[in-house]
């Protein structure tokens, strides 16, 4: 949630608890959280759709020692980040016609790759979700600050050599 990185996704023909479990299994495998001892177990934030309130999913979550948090009914803002992702994805994906499920799946795969690794997010200080997820954000922002400082120093140095600008600067200082 904090990085907006899409860990796992699946194109399903149904909205069943088994589909949710399958996607969660992919996420667990990707992160490796099932192979190491973690301080904070992952949690699932979802709406109140039938697949999320089923006993089957509750048992699955309990067996994985994962917490399930549901948003307030009729309050999609609780899941605002993923709702925004879905809107962005639909705006891109709906531009094409897909005649076979594999075509749609291929396009979704390309979109997730772009979203995670190439699309800068203003809310993430203009880095990608992958940069945040893999812990590169601080280093990137520090490098940007360093470049900005050097650029400003260089501009100042060059402007002081320019007779027109240095006279204006002198007049302003008086």
PLM regions with names:
Residues 1-114:
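RNase H-like DDE/DDD metal-dependent nuclease/strand-transfer catalytic core used by mobile genetic elements
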Residues 40, 62-66, 87-174:
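C-terminal domain-tail junction helix/linker
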């Amino acid at each position: 949630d904090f990085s907006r990185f899409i860990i796992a996704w699946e194109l399903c023909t149904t909205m069943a608890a088994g589909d949710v479990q399958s996607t969660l299994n992919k996420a667990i495998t990707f992160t490796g959280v099932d192979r190491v001892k973690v301080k904070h177990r992952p949690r699932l934030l979802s709406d109140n759709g039938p697949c999320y309130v089923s006993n089957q999913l509750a048992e699955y979550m309990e067996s994985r020692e994962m917490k399930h948090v549901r948003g307030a009914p009729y309050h999609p803002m609780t899941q605002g980040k993923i709702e925004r992702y879905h809107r962005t994805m639909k705006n891109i994906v709906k531009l094409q016609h897909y005649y076979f499920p594999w075509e749609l799946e291929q396009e979704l795969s390309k979109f997730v790759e772009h979203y995670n690794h190439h699309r800068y997010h203003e809310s993430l200080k203009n880095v990608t979700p992958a940069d945040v997820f893999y812990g590169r954000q601080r280093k990137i922002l520090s490098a940007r600050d360093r470049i900005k400082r050097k650029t400003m120093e260089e501009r100042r140095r060059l402007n002081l050599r320019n007779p027109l600008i240095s006279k204006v600067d002198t007049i302003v200082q008086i």
